[in-house]
């Protein structure tokens, strides 16, 4: 066993931060999109989006935008591209549009703009949700990557949004750092 001297400890504490460390230390940025025809028309109060924003902010994320869109795939595709390519947020959460209704097209719009699939996140949400309700198997939500942005579809109800984020939020940091280019060791903890 090697003994570390007090001087070595002080020297290591005085090391300058590398750009990689600086990227790790700045807060993750996020955007939240609620998909709801009634919400977009002002006929229903959105509780899901604010629930997601609150949880993200409590976890230290900087939420850049939160808004409601009607269940129109083309509008969602346009906004996902803008948030990933122009605003360059680390994380986009969508809420709603993941069920079996004919208007539920969030997964299709999300896949249409994806560079890569990240299925484990959506699978994990369904697995954990299945412990609460057997209806979890009816969720069609997906998780994908576009450039440096992770995009995750969440269910539409405020309760399901809180539960889903509760399952995954603690585990996203490492993946988001990798997307930023500031984490290289998948096995490192």
PLM region spans:
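Non-catalytic beta/alpha edge segments that cap or flank active sites
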Residues: 1-189
């Amino acid at each position: 066993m090697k003994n570390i001297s007090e001087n070595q400890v002080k020297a290591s504490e005085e090391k300058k931060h590398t750009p990689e460390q600086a990227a790790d230390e700045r807060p993750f940025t996020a955007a939240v999109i609620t998909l709801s025809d009634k919400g977009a028309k002002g006929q229903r109060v959105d509780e899901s989006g604010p629930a997601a924003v609150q949880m993200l902010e409590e976890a230290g994320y900087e939420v850049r935008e939160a808004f409601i869109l009607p269940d129109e795939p083309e509008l969602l595709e346009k906004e996902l591209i803008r948030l990933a390519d122009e605003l360059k947020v680390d994380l986009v959460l969508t809420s709603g549009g993941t069920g079996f209704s004919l208007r539920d097209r969030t997964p299709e719009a999300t896949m249409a703009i994806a560079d890569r699939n990240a299925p484990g996140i959506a699978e994990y949400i369904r697995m954990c949700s299945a412990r609460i309700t057997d209806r979890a198997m009816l969720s069609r939500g997906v998780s994908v990557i576009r450039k440096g942005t992770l995009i995750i579809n969440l269910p539409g109800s405020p309760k399901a949004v809180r539960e889903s984020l509760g399952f995954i939020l603690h585990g996203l940091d490492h993946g988001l750092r990798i997307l930023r280019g500031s984490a290289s060791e998948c096995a490192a903890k």
